[in-house]
């Protein structure tokens, strides 16, 4: 037999063997993809949109983008009828500023700030010489603006074609005389539900849908009809409202038309974006500051707290301090959008946390409002530039009275669509389990409550017990759970815990105390040690010169002595990998899109349509 004949015979045998395997049901080997795996992953990531919605700024982009598009998270809606009263959501102004006690609280807070400034020595070993506002006021009151140009170069948004809505920068630059309402759909990290026009849940969701759809079309150049080919990664706050998250997911999948979604927490995404596995995340935003401890991709529930102040409060405080020093731009109004933009710019330009910068300094700034001449102002400032950012550590300086300033992680209100929510599980527990829980409640209530103290030691265990056991029980539910005196005792214990929580949440914790409290709520000393060794600051609210050294000094001085002895270094990171701290969380969302484990987290449109909120309980990477 020739070589050619032998080859033909072998080929024939191979083909026969393949046919035999097919008949037996043996799977054929998968044909290797024509596109290399790395390129496939890139193509897949290019069809994932990462959305990080903030109170003031929306960050949105493809997972493959180096940087996201950042636009003001605001919408202007045209009036349906002429003559309607204008409605504008406030930016720098907020509830609780004009109470009778506000000014006294502001002054007391400023005294604490001044005491802290004086007590810390400069790097040369001497103490700072305080500068009173009177020293700058006499000079500033004489200052008059110089006209740089009769045209500022900025213009109001053209509304001659009567658009139904305007988004982002265009909404900010709508002429106040035009018939448009201004809405910021997210306030202090939550949906901006309020009793005024456009304040219902439906209206807020409609505003968000319009803003996000506009951004996707304009900045990502994706036609809305093509969103069925795209998937979305949505970043949510660590302390989230389940109802709001459910509605946002429904909007993204069913109304905007994305094919799938992954929902994840900002803090965990910040660790992905920074490349750190375990760290205490301090997210200082424009309107809220959130603190929590993240370990190996898990945000510890008991360590989460949200403070109802941020960068915009520092801007408003800086304006108040400049007014005391005779701020020469006397027409400045906190109700004017252009003036709010100016004050934000002045804060970012002049404020710092450097103890070595002291005495009076000369500064200048320009005002370029639309349809107005360009003006140049010169003025002097002293300690005001340091006092304003220090208000983050002494929030009484903000002068906010009668508002809930600290939020802990609470048990949710329950969802009728979710058959496994906590309320349902509690209602179906056996009598034995309920009795055991009641006994545990009484024991925990008998222990002293330490919220009034320094928020350390035994007191830190209380929020953990509260979160684990806090239930909203009516009298009828209480009677069902246990009989007679047991029911009364349990309700008394519950009320005492709720009183402790309300007292704690009424206080405005300083940033350093909030960090210490969060770390102190960790379950083990090893975890606490990890968190003290790595504190990551993200967001744009603490982007001041020398903020890293300042925060590090505050934490070192206030941390428990037992940890001070064993921790070699408290590492405060404000710019991981030299990245903009405002973009870290978004970048982490983009990293999440590329992880292999993320494949298990996707919730697809058909699944959501069929199972609804149950998919979040099944697929979310955190405890829903």
UniProtKB/Swiss-Prot annotation:
Show the SMART domains listed in the entry: ACTIN
Q: What is its main location?
A: nucleus
Q: What's an example Gene Ontology biological process for this entry? A: chromatin remodeling
Q: Which UniProt keywords apply?
A: Acetylation, ATP-binding, Cell cycle, Cell division, Chromosome, DNA damage, DNA recombination, DNA repair, Mitosis, Nucleotide-binding, Nucleus, Phosphoprotein, Transcription, Transcription regulation
Parts of the chain that traverse the membrane: none
Q: Where is the composition biased (Basic and acidic residues)?
A: 1-25
- Whether Nucleus counts among this entry's keywords is yes
Which parts of the sequence carry Phosphoserine? 132, 412
The UniProt entry's GO CC annotations, sorted and at most eight, read:
centrosome; Ino80 complex; nucleoplasm
> What's the short name of a Pfam family annotated to this entry?
Actin
| GO molecular function per UniProt | ATP binding
Which residues in this protein are found as N-acetylmethionine?
1
Q: Where is the region Disordered?
A: 1-29, 430-460
Q: Where in the cell is it found?
A: Nucleus; Chromosome
* Positions bound to ATP: 55-56, 283-286
Q: Which family does the UniProt entry place this protein in?
A: Belongs to the actin family. ARP8 subfamily.
**Biological role:** Plays an important role in the functional organization of mitotic chromosomes. Exhibits low basal ATPase activity, and unable to polymerize. Proposed core component of the chromatin remodeling INO80 complex which is involved in transcriptional regulation, DNA replication and probably DNA repair. Required for the recruitment of INO80 (and probably the INO80 complex) to sites of DNA damage Strongly prefer nucleosomes and H3-H4 tetramers over H2A-H2B dimers, suggesting it may act as a nucleosome recognition module within the complex.
Q: How does it assemble?
A: Component of the chromatin remodeling INO80 complex; specifically part of a complex module associated with the DBINO domain of INO80. Exists as monomers and dimers, but the dimer is most probably the biologically relevant form required for stable interactions with histones that exploits the twofold symmetry of the nucleosome core.
Q: What is the name of the protein in this document?
A: Actin-related protein 8
Q: Which organism is it from?
A: Ailuropoda melanoleuca (Giant panda)
Q: What is the lineage of its organism?
A: Eukaryota, Metazoa, Chordata, Craniata, Vertebrata
Q: Which gene specifies this protein's sequence?
A: ACTR8
């Amino acid at each position: 037999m020739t070589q050619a004949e032998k080859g033909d015979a072998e080929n024939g045998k191979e083909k026969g063997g393949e046919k035999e395997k097919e008949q037996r049901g043996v799977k054929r080997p998968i044909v290797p993809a024509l596109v290399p795996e790395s390129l496939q992953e890139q193509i897949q990531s290019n069809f994932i949109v990462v959305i990080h919605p903030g109170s003031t700024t929306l960050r949105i982009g493809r997972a493959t983008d180096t940087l996201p598009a950042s636009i003001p998270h605001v919408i202007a809606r045209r009036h349906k009828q002429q003559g309607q009263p204008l409605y504008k959501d406030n930016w720098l102004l907020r509830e609780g500023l004009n109470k009778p006690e506000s000014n006294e609280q502001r002054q007391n807070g400023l005294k604490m700030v001044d005491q802290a400034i004086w007590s810390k020595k400069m790097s040369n070993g001497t103490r700072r010489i305080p500068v009173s506002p009177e020293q700058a006021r006499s000079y500033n009151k004489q200052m008059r603006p110089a006209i740089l140009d009769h045209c500022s170069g900025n213009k109001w948004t053209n509304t001659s074609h009567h658009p139904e809505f305007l988004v982002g920068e265009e909404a900010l630059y709508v002429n106040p005389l035009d018939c448009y309402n201004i809405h910021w759909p997210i306030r202090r990290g939550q949906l901006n539900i309020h009793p005024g026009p456009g304040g219902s849940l439906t209206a807020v969701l409609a505003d968000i849908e319009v803003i996000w759809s506009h951004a996707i079309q304009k900045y990502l150049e994706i036609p809305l009809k093509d969103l069925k080919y795209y998937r979305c990664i949505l970043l949510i706050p660590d302390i989230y409202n389940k109802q709001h998250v459910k509605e946002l997911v429904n909007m993204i999948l069913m109304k905007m038309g994305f094919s799938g979604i992954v929902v994840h927490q900002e803090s965990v995404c910040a660790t992905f974006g920074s490349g750190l596995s375990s760290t205490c995340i301090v997210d200082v935003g424009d309107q809220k500051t959130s603190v929590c401890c993240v370990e190996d991709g898990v945000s510890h529930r008991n360590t989460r707290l949200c403070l109802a102040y941020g960068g915009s409060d520092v801007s408003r405080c800086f304006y108040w301090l400049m007014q005391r020093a005779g701020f020469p731009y006397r027409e400045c109004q906190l109700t004017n959008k252009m003036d709010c933009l100016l004050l934000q710019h002045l804060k970012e330009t002049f404020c710092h946390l450097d103890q070595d910068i002291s005495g009076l300094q000369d500064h200048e700034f320009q005002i370029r409002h639309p349809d107005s001449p360009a003006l140049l102002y010169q003025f002097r400032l002293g300690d005001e530039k340091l006092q304003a950012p220090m208000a983050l550590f002494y929030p009484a300086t903000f002068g906010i009275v009668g508002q809930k300033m600290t939020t802990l992680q609470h048990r949710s209100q329950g969802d009728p669509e979710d058959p496994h929510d906590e309320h349902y599980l509690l209602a179906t527990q056996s009598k034995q389990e309920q009795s055991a829980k009641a006994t545990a409640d009484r024991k925990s209530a008998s222990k002293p409550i330490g919220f009034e103290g320094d928020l350390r030691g035994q007191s830190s265990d209380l929020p953990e017990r509260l979160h684990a056991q806090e239930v909203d029980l009516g009298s009828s539910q209480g009677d069902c759970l246990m009989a007679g005196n047991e029911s009364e005792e349990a309700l008394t214990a519950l009320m005492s815990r709720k009183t402790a929580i309300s007292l704690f949440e009424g206080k405005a914790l300083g940033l350093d105390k909030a960090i210490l409290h969060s770390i102190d709520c960790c379950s083990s000393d090893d975890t606490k040690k990890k968190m003290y060794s790595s504190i990551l600051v993200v967001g744009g609210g603490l982007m001041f010169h020398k903020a890293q050294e300042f925060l590090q000094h505050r934490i070192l001085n206030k941390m428990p002595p037992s940890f001070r002895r064993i921790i070699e270094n408290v590492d405060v990171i404000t710019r991981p990998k030299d990245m903009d701290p405002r973009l870290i969380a978004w970048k982490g969302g983009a990293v999440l899109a590329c992880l292999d484990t993320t494949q298990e987290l996707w919730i697809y449109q058909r699944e959501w349509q069929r199972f609804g909120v149950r998919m979040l309980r099944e697929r979310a990477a955190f405890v829903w």
